[in-house]
Regions:
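Enzyme catalytic cores with a strong preference for nitrogen-chemistry domains
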Residues: 1-351, 369-378, 410
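ATP/NTP-dependent adenylation/nucleotidyl-transfer catalytic domains that generate, transfer
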Residues: 7, 23, 159, 216-218, ...
């Protein structure tokens, strides 16, 4: 698939125990269905040719012979299909019986992977029938008339990705084989399983899959036995999970009475980028001496981008189910960061410029929470509203109402006269509303805040957010500067949700109403005079673009290192019906240009707590101020 995605499938057929022909027929139909959906790799449950619950029938030669014949038929039946298939079979070898995964494609068996860890406790008795891979030396084995490699450390490469296979209990071991496979280069791990269900076990299993996927920085595709297996003592729910670097992207229905196939796309490009960034991953390779063998599959032609997985248009914003948890955690990080800075500096007051906008509102709320935690009087928070040429009644009123309801000290200082004097001093026409006109107001406000902080042994609390820093939407040495920036790692789309979350937790109805009105106010620096009706004329998103788009671009550039081409393709999916292609391209180009040419502002940022992604020059993002954006802009032009 295009853009580094690999389409995979976790298949759960309805088996008949010991009826190999039936089971092979089921799998042939599902492989054909997978091919029609452009699936590149499909996995079936453990011992799927025979069924897992054959018990002592595994010792019967008639079953083992029929299993191999059915596998041979399946390989031949699907030889015209490019799909790589992974099926389970009991495989006789050198007087032992191996619980094996067979990997095949286009009529050729690529390799046999033996199960390493055989459970032999509680309801499991696998050592009664099978030998472990630990007892089976690496070798070439005969199966279905083909001579193929058999070993536990085996990688398969397709041209689009490299993958490995482990079987059921392997995942539950202290150090799963997939850990070594990942270190050797496996980007996706496939697990064929026979996990029976007990109360509470599924939740544990899901977490196990997610954790192993995250720890290995890999995709993890899990397929477990389902309907048709014997229920003499246990029940198999037919669990299917597709996990991408710790996040479940697709999950099949459990306890279904018919066969099911779960399809999803693993973002291999993102996995590769994460492994490059995480240098600990590379260092871990030195902890083991096992060497995997690599088997080449037939190259597969990438299909067009047709994702079954969703693309989140608001990647920074927690889902509704997690909103309380994450908002509380974010707010606590901001509060604790500021509290430590006050404890260290022994500053007596916090000085904040309050505009009636989202960012200064969140900064004020953080300061209030910090002072409450430190048992300091809220009156030592000095909120300064500084009306200018573009201040509207709505933001001015909200600023005053908010400060009053929170019980902080209120100061009002108009910057109009000082700016007019400044324009006279430098010879600037007050009617020319250019960058000088705008930036002089921002710098005048910052000067006032700094001087008040000096007067009151205070600390100026920065209000700028991550999105503004990415775009350089701040006046250099104006609102760009502070003594501690509590919002520096919080993107604009998240600021809005945080303020709304805090508002809904307040008992004070006046404060709550004010906060919710601030959330609904158009984003603006208010540096240009209002329109004739007194409404905001200078709207930020009309100038630099929608913050929903910019935060989407920022997340995918910083978190995944994606190219403009891939970001554009994902944005088309995420914002389908909301923004057309021309709009997305326009603002993506703007983002790339501004992200590069505004780096000089980020190179001298004040301190501030990391929340998630960060552009701090001392931490997450070390970029030269004079780097060129040519490569990124050239790609934007070709979109």
């Amino acid at each position: 698939m295009e853009y580094g995605f690999v389409k995979v499938a976790s298949a759960v057929p309805t088996v008949k125990v010991a009826d190999c022909r039936h089971n092979a027929g089921q799998m042939a139909e599902m492989i054909a269905d997978a091919a029609n959906q452009n699936v590149e790799i499909i996995i079936f449950p453990e011992l799927s040719i025979t069924g897992y619950t054959c018990g002592d029938l595994f010792a019967q030669s008639v079953l083992l012979e029929e299993a191999e014949k059915s596998l041979e038929w399946l390989v031949a039946e699907t030889q015209s299909l490019p799909v790589i298939s992974i099926v389970g079979i009991p495989h006789p070898h050198n007087g032992s019986l191996i619980n094996a995964a067979v990997v095949f494609q286009s009529g050729k068996i690529l390799g046999v992977v033996p199960k390493t860890f055989l459970p032999n406790y509680k309801e499991f008795y696998e050592k009664r029938w099978f030998a472990s891979a630990l007892q089976t030396p690496e070798c070439v084995t005969s199966i279905c008339g083909q001579r193929v490699p058999m070993q536990r450390d085996m990688l398969f490469t397709t041209g689009n990705t490299t993958f490995g296979v482990e079987i059921c209990e392997d995942l539950w071991s202290t150090i799963p084989p997939s850990s070594f496979l990942a270190l050797e280069g496996a980007e996706i791990v496939f697990n064929m399983s026979a996990d029976n269900d007990c109360v509470g076990k599924h939740s544990y299993l899901r977490n196990l899959v997610k954790q192993q996927s995250a720890r290995c920085i890999a995709g993890y595709v899990f397929s477990s036995c389902g309907f048709g297996e014997s229920t003499t003592d246990v029940v198999f729910a037919g669990t299917s999970i597709i996990c991408d670097n710790g996040s479940i992207i697709a999950e099949g229905e459990r306890f279904a009475m018919d066969r099911r196939m779960t399809v999803g796309e693993i973002d291999v490009e993102s996995i590769r980028n994460d492994r490059r960034v995480n240098t600990t991953f590379a260092e871990s390779r030195g902890l083991h001496s096992r060497q995997a063998v690599t088997i080449n599959a037939l190259p597969q032609t990438p299909s067009a981008l047709n994702l079954t997985r969703t693309v989140n248009p608001l990647p920074f914003v927690p889902s509704d189910s997690n909103l309380d948890y994450y908002c509380e955690e974010i707010f606590a990080i901001q509060t604790t960061g500021l509290a430590q800075r006050f404890a260290h500096t022994h500053a007596e007051t916090a000085v904040i410029g309050i505009s009636g906008g989202l960012d200064s509102t969140l900064a004020l709320l953080v300061a209030v929470n910090t002072f409450d935690k430190l048992h300091k009087d809220r009156k030592n928070i000095i909120g300064v509203t500084m009306p200018g040429f573009g201040t509207t009644d709505r933001t001015y009123t909200n600023a005053l109402c908010l400060m009053e309801s929170l019980g902080v000290t209120i100061r009002e200082i108009s910057i109009k006269d000082s700016c007019i004097q400044h324009f006279n001093d430098i010879g600037h026409d007050i009617n020319v509303h250019d960058v000088t006109y705008e930036n002089s107001q921002a710098r005048e406000r910052t000067q006032l805040l700094m001087d008040i902080a000096n007067q009151r042994n205070g600390m100026v609390i920065g209000t700028g957010d991550l999105s503004e820093l990415a775009l350089g939407w701040a006046t250099y040495n104006g609102d760009h500067m502070s003594m501690y920036g509590v919002n520096a790692s919080v993107p604009k789309t998240l600021v809005k949700h945080l303020v709304e979350w805090i508002a809904n937790r307040l008992d004070d109805e006046k404060a709550k109403t004010t906060l919710l009105d601030i959330v609904d106010t158009p984003i603006s620096p208010e540096l240009i005079p209002a329109d004739k009706n007194g409404n905001i004329k200078q709207k930020t998103e009309d100038i630099v673009g929608p913050y929903e788009l910019h935060d989407f671009f920022l997340y995918n550039l910083l978190r995944h290192g994606f190219s403009p081409k891939k970001i554009f393709a994902l944005a088309q999916i995420a914002f389908d019906g909301e923004f057309d292609n021309a709009t997305i391209k326009k603002w993506l180009t703007t983002f790339c240009r501004r992200f590069f040419n505004q780096q000089f502002k980020r190179s001298c940022l004040p301190d501030g707590p990391k929340i998630g992604l960060s552009l701090s020059p001392r931490g997450d993002w070390r970029m030269p101020s004079d780097a060129t954006s040519r490569l990124w802009l050239d790609e934007c032009e070709k979109l």
